[in-house]
Regions:
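Single conserved hydrophobic/aromatic residue that forms the stacking wall/gate
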Residues: 1-14
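Short, amphipathic, aromatic/basic-enriched membrane-interface segments that mark the entry/exit
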Residues: 44-56, 74-75, 97-106
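Structural signature of hydrophobic alpha-helical transmembrane segments
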Residues: 70-85, 131-136
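C-terminal ends of transmembrane helices
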Residues: 87-99, 145-154, 220
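Cytoplasmic-side transmembrane-helix entry/capping segments in multi-pass membrane proteins
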Residues: 100-111, 130-136, 159-163
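Hydrophobic alpha-helical transmembrane segments in multi-pass integral membrane proteins
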Residues: 116-128, 171-190
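Alpha-helical transmembrane segments
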Residues: 127-140, 204-208
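Membrane-helix boundary/juxtamembrane motif in polytopic membrane proteins
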Residues: 150-175
Length: 231
């Protein structure tokens, strides 16, 4: 019984911590919205929308900063930079899985980064890595092309936007693989056939394509459940 009570208390405490983080982000967003309103930059009707937008921006900045900090601590800062760039740039057009709370989003964002590093380490130690990594990249690219863009239930897209996002997603995927291919060649040539840091960057870019694709599939599944409950 005592263990159960302690466990319950810890769950309640964690819940309040999460609410505290969300409240802090919400409070800062409201302050910014009020400031913009006082400067006549937005109207009274736009304050709520502005505050929500600021919440998303602040939460996003926190996520990016946390990944960079983890990258510095673990000595993987370049991977952290690439992770942030690809997650922000490509997922802007593909869409994908999003947590229900800002705290959950931050945890997922950092967790996926750690998973990406683990996947990279596994590939580095596996033989025939070149074949595997390009299969990974191709799989991620096909998932993106076949499923992007994912329309969020709170953010509907017009037909023109869907077509634009689909094309941009495909182009960004091809560009990522092209950059990866070039880095791999340069890495091999500069090290006379031996594996180099540039080759690992190439591996990581391909890994991120698969991760973005898998997050897109998770988002498709989540949106599907939402529409089923809504109907």
């Amino acid at each position: 019984i005592l263990i159960g009570l302690v466990g319950s208390e810890m769950c309640i405490r964690d819940r309040y911590k999460v609410k505290g983080i969300m409240y802090m982000i919400h409070s800062v967003a409201l302050i910014i919205a009020d400031f913009l309103f006082s400067k006549d930059a937005i109207t009274e009707e736009e304050k709520e929308v502005c505050a929500y937008g600021m919440e998303l921006i602040i939460s996003g900045i926190i996520s990016v900063a946390l990944v960079l900090i983890i990258g510095l601590i673990t000595g993987n800062i370049w991977y952290a930079v690439i992770y942030n760039m690809m997650m922000i740039l490509i997922r802007t057009y593909t869409g994908g899985y999003h947590a229900d709370t800002h705290a959950g989003c931050n945890v997922c964002y950092c967790g996926v980064y750690l998973i990406s590093l683990l996947m990279l380490r596994i590939q580095v130690y596996i033989r025939e890595t070149i074949i595997i990594t390009w299969l990974i990249a191709l799989t991620g690219y096909l998932i993106i092309v076949l499923n992007a863009p994912l329309e969020h239930h709170n953010k509907k897209l017009t037909i023109e936007q869907k077509e634009k996002y689909m094309i941009v997603s495909a182009v960004l995927g091809i560009a990522s693989m092209l950059i990866s291919f070039i880095l791999n060649i340069i890495g091999v040539v500069t090290r006379y056939g031996k594996y180099s840091f540039l080759c690992q960057i190439s591996l990581y870019i391909n890994t991120m394509l698969l991760i973005i694709g898998l997050l897109l599939l998770l988002g498709v599944r989540k949106e599907g459940r939402f529409h089923e409950e809504d109907s």
